[in-house]
Amino acid sequence: MTNLSRRNALKNLGAIMALPLFMQTKLFSSENAKKGFKLITDGEVITGAHWGMLKLTIKNGKIIKSEPYEKILKIKNPFLELTGDLVYAKDRIKYPYVRKSYLQNPDDPKPELRGRDKWVRVSYEDAINLIAKELKKTRKKYGAEGVFAGSYGWKSSGNVQNSRILLHRFMNMTGGFVGVLGDYSTGASQFIMPHVMGTLEVYEQQTSWPVVLENSKVVVIWGANPIVTLRISWTVNDDLGLKYFEDLKKSGKKIIFIDPVKNETCQFLDAEWIAPNPNTDVAMMLGMMYELYNSKKYDKEFLENYCVGFDKFLPYLLGKNDETPKTPEWAEKISGVSAKTIKELAHTIFDNRTMIMSGWGMQRAHHGEQPHWALATLCAMTGQIGLPGGGFGLSYHYSGGGVPTAKGGVVGGITTGSTNSGGAEWLEVASKYSFPLARISDALLNPGKTIDHNGQKITYPKKIDFIYWVGGNPIVHHQDTNKFLKAWRLPRTIVVNEIYWTPTARLADIVMPATTSYERDDISMVGDYSNIAIVPMKQAVKPIGESRNDFEIFRDLAEKFGVKDKFDEGKSELEWIESFYDGAYKQVLSMNLIELNGVDMKPFKEFWQENKPVKFLSTMESESYIRHGDFREDPILNPLGTPSGLIEIYSETIEKMHYDDCKAHPMWFEPIEWLGMKNKPAEFHLVSSHPTDRLHSQLNNTSLREHLAIANREPVWINEDDAKAKGIKNGDLVRVFNARGQILAGAFVTKNIKKGVLKLSEGAWYDPLNSSEENTLCKNGSANVLTIDIPTSKLANGNIAHTALANIEKYSGEAPDLTIFKHPDPKA
């Protein structure tokens, strides 16, 4: 399978690092002093985060100002101003804590009391000893199969302090663990698209923005909100993705926006808005395909020379095998978009060079394998795949997809000590046993169960006794919170490294205080796809309380297992940073970029002392890059990674799986819950989009929440006609509920959402009214309390967060106080 993602090059070059044990407070008086570096107590420090390069102003050893390193955008990114909030948050975990019942008897820890028990502060040494003792106990009784450390989440940026990979490295060196397959973002598409296009597509470089701006006549944005999602990147944001959307706005091109919500991007671009019912994108695409075929506006030559299986798909499209032609009129009844609009859209994308930029929300739905497969088929019919400015792209909304890649050095990163996956870093399968990430609840609730997955059988562990989670917040980001809570209370031991008292930390047994990325040194590339710079992530302030770097925690644990030297390889943290930088420096020297391109890259000591990023330039080749252009030029010499080497509209591989919920070609499946179903369990379709004021659940405890909250809760968008019918006014406190749970939210009444649809952004911290009560009210408005926890299909087993119906009503009771942002230890 081919994978061109620039992120892979970044993440798969390095090795791990370590630092002297129990020396956090002495870091800058020892290691840095020996190198001649001092902590800046008054002045400016350059660093980076998911939301971009930062310039921090330090006074008397404290952060007093946070701002962008460079101001290149008209669009403001408020995340860049929140560093002080993050470091000095009231809910910082400053010390190690152990849940009282667990500390009293780890063999009978009363897991049902998680979230209600008292916390006991312990010493760091005692916490390390307790974790090591209980992990050894689990390993002795259950082996690697008893330890779950999949631990998915948006951990901090940085190539040294990668908490998840540090955890995996430690676990691999001490006996193995149970991990996960896939992720929450693209759980369906990352498994279906290799069958269709031969590669992940979702984490691949896109046709470059300069090519799009020069050649595309029409840009269709389908189910995405890049003005919001491009505020962040997996590494350090380069801001250039947003800059290109500013350029798109000024270009005068026809822009069409397809989404049930007229979101920030649609409004910013002043685009034509088409609003289908949620989860009906495939029906709409099929209607467009029927119109193209019926009007003979399709590229027969492209389908014959670059694709396989259109002839097997066609009978379904024409209704010859189910007596249901997929006409625009048929699609109208399902999608709510008029047949006239569907026909016009089909002709528009065929008659004009069109780039369809798709988001990922449509595949986080029941049968989520189908939308991007159908989209690839639609674009194959237009014959524009591989042409300048034509076809489709699945990553323009993410981490700067389409920003030309720079030519320069690439710093290495931490490894798990296992065989590399050759894919995106967080998709690396480092564990001995793995199951699909979205099936965590199912695996805990049904030990030993065997499931289908992408043509294979996977059996869940017979007993998960020990969970270790870092860099994530699963209580918030997993679907059907109440079901997840039942599963979460089954293991004997749960350990969490965390910066704040998140819902996940509150539901653990042992909590280790972790530093923010502003309290430690690190290094990172800038731009997931562009690799436009190397930024020194210099420590800005001393750690708060007894918080420790994640690598320190795992190095200390490794010492308890006798593998410290193997874990750290005898290097300190700064030495690992230096070695990664030196690797990139050698690459630059070998390409003679200092002389040829004027790259200002110096030996490490000067780089670190100078306190500024090293910048690289994009190339003419990257600026003219066309996704699948080589394949288009010669499909024989440049085949795709599919069995046929061609675009597989019909997959014989999938056909042999004999799945009833994912067949051999794209098709419309009725979701388990949607607006068109009979006997609806609730009235409205709930979409849980990316939040404007957070990175998933990160930043929910900052001042930004206070500015954007409504009725001091997560906002829920409701159409003005629906609100009037329900007696709801803008700013009202409302209850959103279904059979799975109930939440409080603040009503945002607007015309910018389709009737019958509610929008409640994911990521609000779960705040139960009564944690001892089943299906209790979430006071803060966590969307996953309402979502469904079943797989997309047997093929991908992705999550279906966007498939859910819910009711809404004005809340008549007294508004309860939020407690989730308060420290659980009154003595702290």
Q: Predicted regions span which residues?
A:
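Long, contiguous, secondary-structure-rich segments that constitute the structural scaffold
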Residues: 544, 549-602, 697, 702-717, ...
